[in-house]
C-alpha cells in the first residue's frame, strides 16, 4: 500500500476541498527536503488520506468489484489485513505480541477481528486498491510497447517477524542465520 496513489482512486474525487488540500499539503511535506525516499514519512503522509477515502465507502460496480476481490483472495487476504491491524496495536514483530495473538487461528484473533472489523476492512481495501493500480500500470506499460509490461521482483525469503511467517508459520523454517540476497547477474 505504500506505493498506492490516493489521487487516482476514483472515490478521492468525492473528498471535500479541505480534505484534498490537506492531502496535497501532506504529499508536498513528505517529499520536501528529502534526498532519499523516506518510506515512513511517505506512509504517514498517505495514511490519513487513504483512511478518508476508505471512509467514503463504495457504490455499485466498485463495491461488487471489491467483494469479488475479497472472495477471490479469501482467507489469506483476511489474515494479512488482520496482521496489519494487529501491528498497529502490538508492533511489527508478531513474535513479541501477547501469545493469544501469535497464531491467526487463535480465538483471540477472531475476537480481535470482530472488535476491529472496520480497520481490518481498511487493510483489505488497501490491497484491492494496490492490485487495481498495479494492473493499470501493467496495462499502461503493455500499451506503451513494453512487451513484458512491468517486471516484478520476487523476494528470496521472508522476515520471521512479518505477515508471511505469522500466517504460514508452520510452513516456514525460520533460520537464525540470514544473509543478504544474491546479486543480480547481468
Language model regions located:
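Extended hydrophobic/aromatic segments used for targeting, binding, or gating
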Residues: 165-179
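Conserved small/polar residues in nucleotide/adenosyl-binding loops
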Residues: 17, 177-184
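Acidic/aromatic-lined carbohydrate-recognition and catalytic surfaces
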Residues: 1-169
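Basic side chains
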Residues: 46, 185-186
